[in-house]
Amino acid sequence: MSMSTEFYNFQFESIEGNKMPLKNFQGKVVLLVNTASMCGLTKQYAGLQELHEEYQDKGLVVLGVPSNSFMQEHTSEDKVKDFCETNFNITFPMTKIEEVIGSEKHPLYGWLREEHGIKPKWNFHKILIDKEGKVVNSYSSLTKPKSEKLIKIIEEKIKG
């Protein structure tokens, strides 16, 4: 199988302030989600954490990207981290606060838009990346983390 390396060329900084190169996730299925603490969909954190707990040992990485692109996120990483831990016991990896649209967007989101036509329209937009770093699909904010269609494709990609 050919490895699509472009995805792995990108890097985030973790919410704790450490380097987070995406190449660390090679060979894993990644569910990339732009998150927000003050959104009507914030309760999706619970489903994302369940996915993380259920599938991390099988090869899934849930990667949260807190974003204020839609004006519903705290302004500091400490507040986001505290909110996520206190309300949802989040243990999956999260990046520092990033823009996911507009001129200040993180380079990965620039690549997703230019190469794949993917642009989050709201918080909790989900993008699934396979073990080779290829974009499988993107799912609207209304697709629940534990929805049948998402779980089916995650399980398929973990096996495949």
Place the predicted regions along the sequence by residue.
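Thiol-/selenol-based redox modules, centered on thioredoxin-like
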Residues: G110, E114-G160
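N-terminal "domain-start" segment that seeds a small globular fold
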Residues: M1-K23, K43
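Thiol-based oxidoreductase modules, predominantly thioredoxin-like and allied folds used
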Residues: G59-S76, T91-G102
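Conserved helix-turn-beta segment immediately C-terminal to the redox Cys motif
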Residues: K28-V29, M38, K43-P66, E85-F88
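Alpha-helical elements of Rossmann-like donor-binding domains used by nucleotide-donor carbohydrate transfer enzymes
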Residues: G47-E50, K79, P107, W111, ...
